[in-house]
């Protein structure tokens, strides 16, 4: 849906659909894989902290047989689609259109605040979670400013 709406806006603005931060010629290139490594490092750091403080326990592997391969692969595909959708919506068209009209920092703060507020719709989110989501959103906006691409954030 996000790609369709962005495509309509791109037609109206006479721009290519990939001009909003996801250039096709950079798909799954270096920025994407650097983002994958950065994301995995953050997840590992957070998980280690949770294990050390007792906030998480591992009781074993619940998957067996073909599910041991298919479930993680489906999860990876799902997370990739979430990444593309969220980034293209918040840091693609919205950030870049506001950036052209209002400047980078107002655009970054507005889109990041919206991103964080919408996460309040998820059950069990708290102020710390929303603060971390806001900080992550700003980091991603800055990465778009530096690289001109959303591929690092998608990774």
Which sequence ranges carry the predicted segments?
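Functionally important transmembrane alpha-helices
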Residues: 129-155
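Membrane-embedded alpha-helical segments of multi-pass membrane proteins
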Residues: 1-4, 69-76, 130-135
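Membrane-interface helix/loop boundary segments of multi-pass membrane proteins
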Residues: 85-110, 142-150
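Membrane-helix interface segments
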Residues: 16, 27-29, 68, 101-106, ...
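Small-polar-interrupted transmembrane alpha-helices in polytopic inner-membrane proteins
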Residues: 43-44, 75, 79, 103-120, ...
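Membrane-interface helix caps and helix-loop-helix hairpins in membrane proteins
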Residues: 58-61, 119-127
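Juxtamembrane helix-loop-helix connectors linking adjacent transmembrane helices
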Residues: 16-88, 95-100
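Alpha-helical transmembrane segments of multipass membrane proteins
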Residues: 1-5, 38, 42, 46, ...
């Amino acid at each position: 849906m996000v790609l369709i709406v962005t495509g309509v806006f791109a037609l109206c603005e006479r721009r290519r659909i990939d001009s909003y931060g996801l250039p096709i010629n950079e798909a799954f290139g270096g920025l994407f894989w650097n983002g994958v490594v950065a994301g995995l490092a953050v997840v590992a750091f957070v998980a280690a902290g949770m294990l050390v403080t007792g906030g998480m326990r591992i009781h074993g592997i619940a998957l067996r047989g073909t599910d041991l391969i298919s479930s993680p692969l489906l999860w990876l595909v799902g997370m990739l689609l979430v990444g593309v959708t969220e980034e293209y919506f918040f840091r693609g068209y919205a950030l870049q259109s506001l950036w052209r009209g209002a400047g980078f920092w107002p655009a970054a703060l507005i889109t990041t605040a919206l991103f964080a507020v919408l996460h309040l719709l998820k059950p069990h989110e708290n102020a710390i979670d929303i603060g971390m989501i806001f900080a992550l959103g700003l980091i991603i906006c800055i990465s778009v400013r530096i690289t001109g691409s959303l591929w690092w954030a998608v990774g």
